[in-house]
UniProtKB/Swiss-Prot annotation:
Binding site for Mg(2+): 84-85, 222, 226, 230
The EC number(s) this enzyme carries: 4.2.3.97
Stated role: Catalyzes the conversion of (2E,6E)-farnesyl diphosphate into (-)-delta-cadinene. Cyclization mechanism involves an intermediate nerolidyl diphosphate leading to a helminthogermacradienyl cation.
InterPro entries: Isoprenoid_synthase_dom_sf, Terpene_cyclase-like_2
Organism: Streptomyces clavuligerus
Superkingdom assignment: Bacteria
Keyword Magnesium applies: yes
Name of this protein: (-)-delta-cadinene synthase
MF annotations from Gene Ontology: metal ion binding; terpene synthase activity
Length: 327
């Protein structure tokens, strides 16, 4: 089990409910993975996916989701785990041009300009189609764009690995959110929690601040949990390692700095949520929209806390394990 990060943080005061559909979502997703030949004949890869339980992560992060929506989100998370591991643990993750070519089919599907031609792209096409059902055009375009940004960020990460460079600490948080696939994952909160937010809310300064604060919390607490594993793997794309290198600090001091940054993001989320309440009132939005906006703001922190709970349980974050390895 991973060491509990940010001990004493206000994030531990956030309730962490759990969907009752986790096991069902895991089971249906594993059947889907096999039927779609996402793992081919790689039994170790499919066994690893079963072991890390994407359905449990979905259940922690989306406790209000219906069983169908939770299964959809579990498929999305399983798809991400498979792609991330294939990139990170092969030459793809260290050759930006090779990876860029490899991802063209997925990019075309994400942007709606290409028909899927392989198992992973067909799976992505299905996920996008199912996620888009009942959602408006603006949400659908945003979801596609955010997936495309994630794929582009994987190439950025590969270019830095290829050069053996530590990321610039000033721009790293932006790219960390992107290659963590946080924004398309957060888009799904609107699907499970009542529908797409109007653009005047979603693109407002308060809601964008809420998204950024919550996304940073997911990424940075993840980095605190995984720093030893990633350091052993030679992966520099971890905020603790970036801080350690940039400030010439030891691991403990750098970890403390990242923990302090997490607390700052918690305060930023609290402030932005208060500002969002004021904005939706000033705009004269219907009570249903104002309540939905506040519910989505609260659900962002539930997502952060849910990811933490799963991270403490999953073997995925333990030092000495790989995507297809054993505990």
């Amino acid at each position: 089990m991973s060491t509990r990060p940010v001990e004493g943080s206000a994030i531990w005061d956030v309730l962490s409910p759990h969907s009752p559909h986790a096991a069902a979502a895991d089971g249906k997703t594993l059947v889907w993975v096999e039927a779609g030949e996402l793992c081919g004949h790689d039994t170790a890869e499919s066994a690893n996916l079963a072991r890390i339980r994407p359905g449990l992560l979905a259940a922690f992060c989306h406790p209000k989701a219906t069983e169908d929506d939770l299964t959809l989100i579990t498929k999305w998370m399983a798809w991400l785990f498979l792609l991330d591991d294939r990139i990170d643990e092969s030459d793809l993750g260290r050759d930006a041009d090779l990876l860029d070519g490899h991802l063209q089919d997925l990019q075309g599907v994400a942007l709606g300009i290409r028909t899927a031609s392989g198992p992973m792209s067909r799976a992505l096409e299905e996920i996008i189609t199912q996620a888009s059902a009942g959602m408006g055009d603006a949400w659908q375009l945003r979801f596609r764009r955010n997936i495309s940004d994630y794929l582009l960020a994987c190439v950025w990460q590969a270019a830095h690995r290829q050069a053996g460079e530590f990321p610039d600490p000033e721009v790293f948080p932006h790219w960390r959110r992107a290659f963590g696939a946080i924004m398309p994952s957060f888009d799904l909160i609107e699907r499970t929690d009542g529908g797409a937010l109007p653009s005047c809310v979603y693109y407002s300064r308060p809601y964008q601040s809420l998204l950024t604060a919550a996304a940073d919390l997911v990424c940075w607490t993840n980095d605190l949990m995984t720093v030893d594993k990633e350091a052993a793997h030679g992966d520099l794309h971890n905020l603790v390692l970036v801080t350690e290198h940039d400030r010439h600090q030891d691991r403990r001091t750098a970890s403390a700095a990242v923990s302090a940054a997490c607390e700052q993001r918690m305060r930023a989320h609290t402030s932005a949520r208060r500002d969002l309440t004021g904005l939706t009132a000033a705009l004269g939005l219907p009570d249903t929209v104002r309540t939905h906006a506040d519910d989505c703001a609260a659900s962002l922190l539930v997502w952060v806390r849910g990811h933490l709970e799963w991270g403490l349980e999953t073997p995925r974050y333990r030092p000495g394990t790989t995507g297809t390895g054993t505990d």
